[in-house]
Amino acid sequence: MSDVEEVVEVQEETVVEQTAEVTIEDALKVVLRTALVHDGLARGLRESTKALTRGEALLVVLVSSVTEANIIKLVEGLANDPENKVPLIKVADAKQLGEWAGLGKIDREGNARKVVGASVVVVKNWGAETDELSMIMEHFSQQ
């Protein structure tokens, strides 16, 4: 036993959580995955127009680079119906929208393979309340 006591100073480090900026596209990807799991997506023009005319649509995602201008006019017209106005988001790439909507195969590493493009996707059921969903709804309330 020694007469000298060792004093150990413990410094507490405060960890500041850095919230990564979540873009609208990232939030949309999470919302579409959640709706896909809960069987709440209508994928493609035929299913989407049926959901829009029945009034089941909660959100419409449209590809802005569709070759047929009539498709854009039809979907925008149904989404902007005065009786049942539905929020509309436009994305650039059909293959990316198809991947988000589950129109492809997933390999062992988790990468998407054989992805089919989608011109329009309609969310009929949110599935679960997430932070990304509230972010998208807040985005539409600001517009």
From Swiss-Prot:
Function description: Component of the ribosome, a large ribonucleoprotein complex responsible for the synthesis of proteins in the cell. The small ribosomal subunit (SSU) binds messenger RNAs (mRNAs) and translates the encoded message by selecting cognate aminoacyl-transfer RNA (tRNA) molecules. The large subunit (LSU) contains the ribosomal catalytic site termed the peptidyl transferase center (PTC), which catalyzes the formation of peptide bonds, thereby polymerizing the amino acids delivered by tRNAs into a polypeptide chain.
GO molecular function: structural constituent of ribosome
Locations listed in the record: Cytoplasm
Biological-process GO terms, alphabetical: cytoplasmic translation; maintenance of translational fidelity; maturation of SSU-rRNA; ribosomal small subunit assembly; ribosomal small subunit biogenesis
GO-annotated cellular components: cytoplasm; cytosol; cytosolic small ribosomal subunit
Gene3D superfamilies: 3.30.1330.30
Family: Belongs to the eukaryotic ribosomal protein eS12 family.
Naturally occurring in which organism (per UniProt): Saccharomyces cerevisiae (strain ATCC 204508 / S288c) (Baker's yeast)
Source species, domain of life: Eukaryota
Zinc-finger is among the record's keywords: no
Name of the protein in its database record: Small ribosomal subunit protein eS12
Subunit text: Component of the small ribosomal subunit (SSU). Mature yeast ribosomes consist of a small (40S) and a large (60S) subunit. The 40S small subunit contains 1 molecule of ribosomal RNA (18S rRNA) and 33 different proteins (encoded by 57 genes). The large 60S subunit contains 3 rRNA molecules (25S, 5.8S and 5S rRNA) and 46 different proteins (encoded by 81 genes).
Keyword annotations of the record: Cytoplasm, Isopeptide bond, Ribonucleoprotein, Ribosomal protein, Ubl conjugation
